[in-house]
Curated annotation (Swiss-Prot):
Gene (name only): argP
Family: Belongs to the LysR transcriptional regulatory family.
Name of the protein this chain belongs to: HTH-type transcriptional regulator ArgP
Family matches, as Pfam families: HTH_1, LysR_substrate
Residue span(s) of domain HTH lysR-type: 4-60
Species whose genome carries this gene: Salmonella dublin (strain CT_02021853)
Length: 297
């Protein structure tokens, strides 16, 4: 059985994290040549490339598996080293989360863990349809995803659902939808998406108004909080989690343009198995809070 040297694995990890050999060498306090040699040793051991030398570099499928192994080992080391040592060096936890969870329920859920545990969070924001891929590639140790199927050697639990409403300000609605939301009026109403892969708005319009993708004008803004601001100032109509705009809906600052219609996204918490003690704390906190504030039906 091939057993990798974890020092060489850390070199591979550093190249991916730092997005290049030069910065990886600086991070590890060794020469760039030494980084290359360590990765070459790993590749010789496994008889195949572990790194695609693009800009930035990315791991091969085998490289992803080794990085996932490294993440598990780092977490399990925390389990074995004991409270005295781990308390002096905060444990780094890299998690892949969607922007809407980060803007609504995730940070309050993690607050108790952050208050009494020596950890440093590295929250990597990604669309909920793609967060699981970061776990697969070994970039993170946990992920909030819409995928219900667990990856090999991973665990999964249901968190609950975010309900998205199609909203806008009242002046926006009066301008673009004076006779209600119709297929023809939607073609002129500016919308917003998180990125070019965010299809929630398009999917909602296609499902309920038979509008094909790309048929409405759409801004690209990488911020959940900015969605709310754009809607409040009358710039766009957009899909926003109900949990995020309860006050705006109650005050009338925003209105639900399509009562009775919503887009529901069920979320799941994925992580490596077995769980370390610290990851178990994170899991318990996310599940407890998620079950309180997210839809469970």
């Amino acid at each position: 059985m091939k057993r990798p040297d974890y020092r060489t694995l850390q070199a591979l990890d550093a190249v991916i994290r730092e997005r290049g050999f030069e910065r990886a060498a600086q991070k590890l306090c060794i020469t760039q040549s030494a980084v290359s040699q360590r990765i070459k040793q790993l590749e010789n051991m496994f008889g195949q490339p572990l790194l695609v030398r693009t800009v930035p570099p990315r791991p091969t499928e085998q490289g992803q598996k080794l990085l996932a192994l490294l993440r598990q080992v780092e977490l399990l080391e925390e389990e074995w080293l004991g409270d005295e040592q781990t308390g002096s060096t905060p444990l780094l936890l890299s998690l892949a989360v969607n922007a809407d969870s980060l803007a609504t329920w995730l940070l309050p859920a993690l607050a108790p863990v952050l208050a009494d545990s020596p950890i440093r969070l590295n929250l990597q924001v990604e669309d909920e349809t793609r967060t699981q891929e970061r776990l697969r590639r070994g970039e993170v140790v946990g992920a909030v995803s819409i995928q219900h199927q667990a990856l090999p050697s991973c665990l999964v639990d249901k968190l609950g659902a975010l309900d998205y409403l199609f909203v806008a300000s009242r002046p926006f609605a009066e301008r673009y939808f004076p006779n209600g939301v119709t297929r023809s009026s939607l073609l002129k109403a500016p919308a917003v998406a998180f990125d070019h892969l965010d299809d929630m708005h398009q999917a909602f319009l296609q499902q309920n108004f038979d509008l094909p993708p790309g048929s409405v004008p759409c801004h690209i803004v990488n911020s959940s909080e900015a969605f709310v601001q754009l809607a409040r100032q009358g710039t766009t109509c957009c899909m926003i989690p109900h949990l995020q705009i309860e006050k705006e809906l109650e005050s009338g600052e925003l209105i639900n343009l399509t009562p009775g219609l919503l887009q529901r996204r069920m979320l799941y918490w994925h992580r490596f198995a077995p769980e370390s003690r610290m990851m178990r704390k994170v899991t318990d906190a996310l599940l407890e809070y998620g079950h309180k504030v997210l839809r469970q039906d």
